Amino acid sequence: MLRCSMADAPVTTRTFEHEGRQLVYDEYGAGPRTFVLIHGLLLSRRMHAPLATALADRGHRVVVPDLLGHGESERPRDMWRYSMPIFGEEVLGLLDHLELDEAVVGGTSLGANVSLETAVREPGRIRGLVIEMPVLDNALLGCALAFSPLLVWLTFGEPLARLVAAGARLAPRGLSHLADMGLDWISQDPGPSAAVLQGLFFGRVAPPRAERAAIEAPALVIGHPRDPIHPFSDSDMLVRELANGTLLEADSILELRMRPERLTGEIGDFLDQCWRPARRGAARTRRAAG
């Protein structure tokens, strides 16, 4: 699959195969400075389109995938196919597909935790990390309260959820980026979405503290107040654990979506720093495919 658009930065949509499953990704911009940007839970790569476009305009190549079970990638109904470590392997598989020795990797919420999984698996391939809204130790109660009812709805209410999804697919898009994200979220097939939640519930949420503390790559950690699922205390804790972490406080969960200029500038500056010559050691060796 190959689709191109010329709105702002050129965007190319491609696919690759990982462990026998087809995954979709968008590519914004071009060049050697690659940033892999990962979406949130049950969202799609389109959530990061504005940020990816802005960073591509600054000279970065931004690659935005749909993880398995999300967006336009394959969406099997088997819960065992989904876990944070598996998602981390998918990102490494994408680097292999792109023939990249190293990249900056980052994401939001689920994408933040997947980025950490990628970093602990192959630290030599991580030029830097952009971690927005990590879900760690202090988020346990908030996640249980938010996602347990959602899992029940998607599992036992699947017939009704399918009707709601069908109605959402008929709704017009284009009113706003946030509205389109919400409609995309509601219009998903509930079966695979339930499998994603089940798989994540039965696995680890993030690498354990000792593994996080071993990450040496520079990391920009973005947190915000008043969010029980992504408590600011988790972002603060992560920065204290990491060897080279920097904390950036957002005004709210919506700042990067509705008033993105400040945070986009900070992220762009961080990416520029990550790619300064001779700031890391010798060239890395790409992992063998398969």
Residue ranges and their predicted role:
Residues 21-74:
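Conserved HGGG/HGGXW glycine-rich cap/lid loop of the alpha/beta-hydrolase fold
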Residues 107-111, 115:
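Gly/Ala-rich beta-loop-alpha elbow adjacent to hydrolase catalytic centers
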Residues 244-290:
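Catalytic active-site module of serine/aspartate enzymes centered on a nucleophile-bearing elbow/loop
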Residues 228-234:
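Conserved alpha/beta-hydrolase "acid-adjacent" motif
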Residues 215, 221-223:
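Short beta-strand/loop motif that positions the catalytic acidic residue
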Residues 116, 120-121, 127-156:
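Flexible "cap/lid" loop of the alpha/beta hydrolase fold
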Residues 181-210:
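Hydrophobic, aromatic-rich cap/lid helix
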Residues 57, 64-106:
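Active-site loop/oxyanion-hole signature of alpha/beta-hydrolase fold enzymes
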